[in-house]
Amino acid sequence: MNATTINSLFLIGALLVGASILVSSLSSRLGIPILVIILAVGMTAGVDGGGIIFDNYPTAYLVGNLALAVILLDGGLRTRVASFRVALWPALSLATVGVLITTGLTGMAAAWLFDLNLIQGLLIGAIVGSTDAAAVFSLLGGKGLNERVTASLEIESGSNDPMAVFLTVTLIDMLASGHTGLHWSLLTDLIREFGIGAVIGLGGGWLMLQLVNRIHLATGLYPILVVAGGLVVFALTNALHGSGFLAVYLCGLVIGNRPVRSRHGILHMLDGMAWLAQIGMFLVLGLLVTPHDLLPIALPALGLALWMILFARPLSVLVGLAPFKAFHGREKAFISWVGLRGAVPIILAVFPLMAGLPNAQLYFNLAFFIVLISLLVQGTSLPWVAKWLKVTVPPEPAPISRAALEVHVTSEWELFVYRLGAEKWCIGAALRELKMPEGTRIAALFRGQQLLHPSGSTVLEADDLLCVIGHEHNLPALGKLFSQAPERGLDLRFFGDFVLEGDAQLGAVSALYGLKLDGQDADMPLGAFIAQKVGGAPVVGDQVEWNNTIWTVAVMDGNKIGKVGVRFPEGSRPGPGLFL
């Protein structure tokens, strides 16, 4: 490879990445997922478009694995362990039982549609059997979904790859060797993959956390160290025949949920690296496909994609979530619809090509077609379906910007900046009149371009910029004080006519509003009663019916319900009483 060739590669690569970023700005206008646009850029530049011929499957496999490792590390860093209280076991059920059911149903349909034997059909099912972390993390961000749905989908996508990889490799071995029998040793192999991945992931995350917090480096080196450590965990786990995808996700989870030096710098850089990984991966996968090869299989492939979306995935979700009573029917329906396929199926489809199996090109083209349909149909309709199924909650007010204050190694202090909207009640109030959350301080006040020195007598005006020092857990209380809040009508439509304190006694509420206790303990707090009715760990937006009245979880205080919205039947709305 001479200098001219290398220069041409740099030029073409930079132009493709730049074009992907620029064209992605059309995503929100067209309502098309960014990942589809990036895939389209790669396909347009490929053999049937710009004429770039790329058929190096090992390179695509390398790029895909590297990109997925970075994306999963970033996803783990941003996942809160608190979300595990509502979604860990349901997500693991979807990641194991759900993948098995999807693989079986999709495989049988594929065998019938494409005149393959059962093992070949099941291989197709295994290749497309898992949801994709890159697609899920990318498309769920900022959609305002309730915590149970979001956490279930994110944890599932971060943990279901081991099952899909295991099934794919096992079925490839069967086809290559001609042995089609199943042995109990396969189950032990699967448990080993999960076990090695979990142990190395958790252990590697803890070691990286200690290393980052104990050594002194230039600020910009900490994110690189975390990425390098994540890749070591990924590669070492794979070398020991464990699940590298699970390991790197858990590694990020450990680091992201403990005090860590340069936390915001790490997250900021990982965000950019994860985007670059997604762009590079989907560009390469777009270049790898030959669009005209998809046309002969388009109709049966479309039928298989619709079978998986409309039957296999919903049935796997119904079975996988059957033991978990907290999930409402509309939540199960939404989780069924968001069985997003992305890069993982295409990367798994490279395995048969590298193994030299018959029909390997068919497997690859099918996987690509199904991913394209999944992103176009499910990804594009996701916001509409979320609103239709009522799994969204009113957005929490947030600061316009936030920055870390590195006052010591594991400092969790942050600086939050709020712009005061004209409708906020605090406009015209003196600072001494504000009920600030404990442990927070107002650091500065900007009016126009002027920096003011705030004092207790300073009166707030519309469009003031207020800088507040606090912790992440102070954000809900600060948001109510200073942020541009959603319209009150939105809260009333969602939470009900009034909002009641969660520690109000059930007997007092029943007596004041003429409700029947039906044998319930009168001294039980309303929040505990609603949690009992939910049947699992409650989240904001959970609704139950009691005494012909709709009760909605409005605020969570840790693991307890802090406030409950209540909607009375039409024409029977009482006065506010205990309601706040």
UniProtKB/Swiss-Prot annotation:
| Major place of residence | membrane
Protein known as: K(+)/H(+) antiporter NhaP2
Q: Which GO terms describe its biological process?
A: cell volume homeostasis
Family that this chain belongs to = Belongs to the monovalent cation:proton antiporter 1 (CPA1) transporter (TC 2.A.36) family. NhaP2 subfamily.
Q: How is it placed in the membrane, per its record?
A: Multi-pass membrane protein
- For this protein, the parts annotated as crossing the membrane are 6-26, 34-54, 57-77, 94-114, 121-141, 162-182, 193-213, 217-237, 240-260, 269-289, 292-312, 334-354, 366-386
Write out the catalysed reaction.
K(+)(in) + H(+)(out) = K(+)(out) + H(+)(in)
Q: What does this protein do?
A: K(+)/H(+) antiporter that extrudes potassium in exchange for external protons and maintains the internal concentration of potassium under toxic levels.
Q: Which domain of life is it from?
A: Bacteria
SUPFAM superfamilies recorded: FAD-binding/transporter-associated domain-like (SSF56176), TrkA C-terminal domain-like (SSF116726)
Query: Which UniProt keywords are listed?
Result: Antiport, Cell inner membrane, Cell membrane, Ion transport, Membrane, Potassium, Potassium transport, Transmembrane, Transmembrane helix, Transport
Instruction: Name a GO molecular-function annotation.
Output: flavin adenine dinucleotide binding
Q: Where is the RCK C-terminal domain?
A: 402-484
User: Mind giving the lineage of the organism this protein is from?
Assistant: Bacteria, Pseudomonadati, Pseudomonadota, Gammaproteobacteria, Pseudomonadales
InterPro entries reported for this sequence: Cation/H_exchanger_TM (IPR006153), FAD-bd_PCMH-like_sf (IPR036318), FAD-bd_PCMH_sub2 (IPR016169), Na+/solute_symporter_sf (IPR038770), NhaP2 (IPR023729), RCK_C (IPR006037), RCK_C_sf (IPR036721), Transptr-assoc_dom (IPR005170)
Q: Report the subcellular localization.
A: Cell inner membrane
GO cellular component terms, semicolon-separated = plasma membrane
- Pfam families the UniProt entry points to: CorC_HlyC, Na_H_Exchanger, TrkA_C
